[in-house]
Amino acid sequence: MLCDNLENWCLRMSDRMWARQRFITQGCIERGRLKASAESESKVILYRAPLGYGKSVQVAFEAGTQGREEGGVAYINTRSYPGSGEITDSLLAALILYQIKGREPWSVIQSNDDIIESLRDTLCNAKNPIKICIDGIGEAEHGVGLVENLICETPNNVKFYIAPSNAGALARLSMMAGVVTYGAHDLVFTEEEVCELPGMHSAKAKNVIEATGGWPALVGLMCHTSNPNLPAATWPETRSYFRNNLLNALPNNTREFICKAAMLEEISVACYDYVYKTEEAHKEIPFINENYALFTPTESSRECMVMHPVLREYLRGLFDSIQRERRSYVLKRVAFWHWRRGEYLHSINAAQEASDHSWARAVSDSIILDVALRQGEIEVLRTWFEKVPVRTIKKIASLSISYAWILYFSQQARQAEKILASSTESCSRGLDNLDEKGWRKLVDAVGKATQDQFAQSQTLCQQWIDTFGERNMVGKGAALTCQAYIASSDRRFEDLEQLLHRGAVANQSSNQHYAFVWLKTAELQAEIFKGDIAHAMSILLEANKTAEKMGVSKTFLNKMLGSLELQILHEKSPSLISYESAEESFNFALNYGVTDILWGCTQTFSSFLYQQGLRDRAMAILEQTRIAACERDLPRLNMLAKIQLAEFTLINDEELEPPILPDESELTFLPNQNQAIRARIALVNSMYRLRLGKQFGVAEKYAKKALQSASAISDARTKIAAQYCQALAVFGLGSSKLAKRTIIDADQLTEHLSCYFTRDWIKEALMSFSPIARDLFDTLPESAETNATKDLEVRKEEADARPKLTNTQSTITIKQISLLKCVSSGMTNKEIAERLLITEDTVKWHLKKIFSELKVTNRVRAVSEARLRGLL
């Protein structure tokens, strides 16, 4: 090609490529974590992933971060070539050279060799940073060698950003020094990135990630589909995308292979060849990985692979439509393959889909008990057991015991008791062997706790540990976990600490996954009961990390911890949760949660709905829980729902009717559970007297009673609400100064523990029905409620970062911590006194106490030491 013609060709090609670059990036978000600046020392950034992971977008964005007029960037997109695969090394070099230098070099170029040499000279002598961004290379033989040579020969200020045309292209690059590869795992969207898309928020983003697995193409489709609540594999857009962009690009035999592979629980050469009676998997699997990267190795074995769950569901549907008559046969072979290898959960999953339960008679005792009691696959086994004939279950003791366990944790206690009783019948197979390890008695003991019969469960669990604990470590972990949960529910926090330690040892030594989740639930629930939301969040994060290391199944883990996370986030700020996430957790708790779990989700969901103005829906949720409590014979749950209904009615109704509350004579639960309910009853009674606008003395009496009960069980949230009621009552009695100090005490506790919703809720409730409430709150100093109310994001970050106090013997009070916060912000003694409504002498007295406790001599060192101890 003549130089003039070559120059014109480069101009046309470059314009087309840069037009494509602008189009590709339209409506897309820049992901800073994937930008070259995140890998400043790297020479090459390589994006290697399946179709639809945003590789082209990343390369296009990198090209756009440096102005073309600077002459420091070249953007090559092979899809703009006139006939892909016909571009020689010299033409590729000409395109890069033209985009970097413009017309300047063309006057001295005489041949193709001159073009390549001129490009080499330009890059090697460049003083400023140069970017070469290439999208789609690898489709032809030409160009790859040139690019690899340029990478090796040019200085570090010349950087390359490359998206190969297929997953296996440019394999040698991956082995070079200074090459950073971003794979599918790196390129999936995070929740934070989804939030940047139009119309997204944090709660909705979580649903998007769960539905799509973060696959960027599917995220984009979900934003536009009219059926986002349906499974992603069923969206018309998804089906069209997979058909047109993936299946049509595959050879016929490969297309058939991946459809068949989707029917497997895990994809491996041996499994595929066994199920389908072939010998082709050893060729197809490497070919698919090399060219399309559709399979990902599992964590447990590099030989076993999985595909993206949405793609798998789509391909399974395709298999059903083409070979429906073979579906059951194939799944039975899959089940037998895993059964033979001892992979029983996979086997049960496959058999369940095949509706094959004939082998239930052959299942060994150890297998079913392991899957049920240790792995805790409650939902999977519940579906499976429902399809197994009851007569078969009753004839085999291990099935009866396991099914009873499943039913107890599915809140079907009456049926569980009947099934468990059937395991003692003389015709039941294998009972003697199971009783040697105490399985039946363990299920009975723990089952009592699921029905809120804690006193009986505590006794039975201790008897079980004394009798069977040394010969059944899995069972011991379950029994200790049950005792820990009982201690948490009864607010016996000192006993809980010891039981958490003993339970963790037993669970880890026996790899007890199900008990691990419940043990963490007990620990988290205790912090929520205390109202220490900041510490609860840190425990939640640590629990997820530990579960990841242990390999705990995420199915139950995510739902259980998610129900607790909902309560934590709602207490920090209702804006952090969504209707969808709250409803999902409520439905899970309704089916699988014991009293405290279900009540926590019910209270959170109903309060969220009430605050959103959906008051009828909020009260309907409480009624739904109350009905469930009556059906399941859970009087404590029924009582808690009644109290919350009374509170809502009190705030909502115009009529000044007394609230309908349980009588204290009905409190027949554990001692501290009774205290918690007494506190709530007294609180609602105080609110009612305040609503009347008179009887302030009676209102104060009830508030003090609530405060006393809440303090006895370390219930900070009820304590804060009671302090607000007490403050309004004494304000109505004429004691303005005492009222203000009481509110400041409540606000200091709120800030320290991050339980903001409780404070905001009670304040709004009091202002909604008491005319004098606004007079009280308006007379407080502007800073009295602390700066936390002004900046949610700051207080959120601080709360997340606050660790548990390492010095448990510290005598520093909440008020003194608030004073330290004032000191850390540079306030004078006078300013602190004005904020906290105390005298300057009192400030000095507190500082003296703080210095003595922290063993320091000045304010600067006091702040530093307080931070080291986790006080700030």
From Swiss-Prot:
The keyword Coiled coil does not apply. InterPro entries: Sig_transdc_resp-reg_C-effctor (IPR016032), Tscrpt_reg_LuxR_C (IPR000792), WH-like_DNA-bd_sf (IPR036388). GO terms for biological process: alkane catabolic process; regulation of DNA-templated transcription. It holds the Pfam family GerE. Residues 829-848 bind DNA. Induction: Induced upon entry into stationary phase. One of its GO terms (molecular function) is DNA binding. It comes from the Bacteria. The keyword rRNA-binding does not apply. Pathway: Hydrocarbon metabolism; alkane degradation. CDD domains: LuxR_C_like. Residues 805-870 form the HTH luxR-type domain. Keywords: DNA-binding, Transcription, Transcription regulation. This protein activates the expression of AlkB1 in the presence of alkanes. This is HTH-type transcriptional regulator AlkS. It comes from Alcanivorax borkumensis (strain ATCC 700651 / DSM 11573 / NCIMB 13689 / SK2). The gene is alkS.
